[in-house]
């Protein structure tokens, strides 16, 4: 009986282990997890910290956040509510949230909680001041970065300035080594660049991006994701400053890095699309081939996809057709759009903005070619969809209806002319034909 209970317990434990296992590239073995269940809190804390770093390194940020939440709970158990290490755990959690889009407010809240804890920790004579300074530095940087994302630029600037000054003082006092300072500077400079660019101050942002790239290349591999991020953002600023060749070059450099990391089809498509857009933005004839090449490459990554990726493919295809129209290849653009119509109806539905816009463009293309009947039919379908989506009084709907009305008037004019001509002909044939005396009427055969 005892043996049966032990077997049951062992089986149950195996089920628990399987349930808490996290599938990932670096997943831990069941044996290690089983050991972890019976570890003391401090050992568990260390394990969670290592797992959080591991997940972050492979960009699995949701799993990293789960581990960072556990770190906060375990740090409270190990050190209490007023220890600087708890502030550090909250800072790390805030940084985790910053990795995910749309969670900057949560990051700010956790950073402010860390600030509150750290203020109490400062009063204790037992803690190592260097540790507290390092934690303060990360706190100011993290809070500044979160505030940039929330577009609270004045508060963000104040926190980033504090981080920069503290890092310089710590370097001078020997609290950190030069390599640590460069790594911190790479992040601070990038946040300053984002702060200025967020305010559309591209000229001021640009030198910060240059410094951020220089420091990032020093501390990371030149082919790292971090470098690719800085290159892409800097290329966007160069585009705003009309430095088009440099912009295309840096987008291309980032694209090569991204492709070397085995990206998802969507990430690869986005990267190629950024080069195409930069080439289009230049407005230069010399860049037309570059734009077409990367539009085609971007679509190739998503060509056989389904669902949201299929929708993205069709969106990129529309953008490519718009580019073709601007460079005078209107017939080619119309042909691609005609072929895409069935797929758009399948993905977006019959009554969707995407389908309406396609009918509008095709209608205008027919109009330009003198095919008034085809134009009228397509624009009629367009206005039906727009009326359903936006109502008959919407500006877009009214503009399409006005085009249809104008087209109808043009179509009616030749009909009236033909009817008038027929009436005149009928009148002429009804007038009696008088024969000159002494002359016979000629037959039709003659």
UniProtKB/Swiss-Prot annotation:
InterPro entries: TPR-like_helical_dom_sf, TPR_rpt, TTC23/TTC23L. SUPFAM superfamilies: TPR-like (SSF48452). The keyword Transmembrane helix does not apply. It comes from the Eukaryota. TPR repeats lie at residues 45-78, 137-170, 186-219, 356-389. GO terms for cellular component: cilium. It is found in: Cell projection, Cilium. GO terms for biological process: positive regulation of smoothened signaling pathway. The keyword Repeat applies. Keywords: Cell projection, Repeat, TPR repeat. It holds the Pfam family TPR_8. Associated with the EvC complex composed of EFCAB7, IQCE, EVC2 and EVC. PANTHER family: TETRATRICOPEPTIDE REPEAT PROTEIN 23. Participates positively in the ciliary Hedgehog (Hh) signaling. This is Tetratricopeptide repeat protein 23. The gene is Ttc23.
